[in-house]
Amino acid sequence: KRQSYAIPSSDGASGVINADKGLGVSNEFTLSASGELDNGMTWSYAQDIDGATVQDDAKLTLTGGFGTVGVFIHEGGLDTDNTASQSVVSRPSDTSYNEGMFDTFDLGGHNTLQYHTPADLLPFGITAKIAYAPAASSAASINSYKATGSANLGTFTASTAAFNSTAAPFGQTSIMGKTATHYQVKAAPIDGLTVGADYLDYDGVVNSTTQSPESGSYYATYAAGPFSVGYSKNFTAFAINAYSGDLTESVEGTKYSVAFNVNDNLSISYENEESNPDNQTATTANYTLEATGIQAAYTMGGMTLAIAQNEFTNAQYTNGLNTV
């Protein structure tokens, strides 16, 4: 489990987002069970309990020589946009400050059926996964085995022209369309090198006549001795009905990071993340949100002490809203 002490501040010209110091402890745990069938196949079940003491993410999988099949409830996202991160604490955009960085759409917030290939089936360490959301227009719910469906209208929420909220930076979320399919491929072609990509496609998105929604990313990492580096790109196109004002139509992101193991106990890292939105016209100015982090972690047995200094430029895609 983790505990943290956060000290936010800001120096931007577009307003001050100073907040009081934050102190917290991990407030979620997982209940799990697994076993083996008479035919040699294995099964696994997991259920998360979150801070509100309610059932959260869940999954039930069956694994054999054919690979893994499973039902994933509100988890099992296949996006790879953050897989390359080498930060020793966490990505700069995944800390206590809600800077609102948008990456890609993902089915981790949906209920999905998934298939994963066996780890040793293909050469060069190639593995593939596919997730299918049969009701993409509905948010995931923690269903029992008696779950029933609801009306699937295939609609979507229009994107906004500027920042909307940290939960939905540009208004539109992955909850849209009648169905959605997410593909992921990873490989380890040579020692130290890993590469991968994902692509998410929607079907039956009603009235997305000007632009259909899609998103994806690719990444690469390389490790040699005490050094490791990572790089990734991500792209998202929002569903658009027709020109209406000046909606955000796409977001492109770039991330790179490097880590160094000073010794068996101490590691340091640097990461830079950028997210650049693009609108239908130049009427609305776009500002690139940038997050950088310098971090260090020291491990003693089963305990890790870590410190991070993260900086944000144009937080919430707002010009001059800079924080530390």
Locations of the language-model features?
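Outer-membrane beta-barrel proteins
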Residues: 1-324
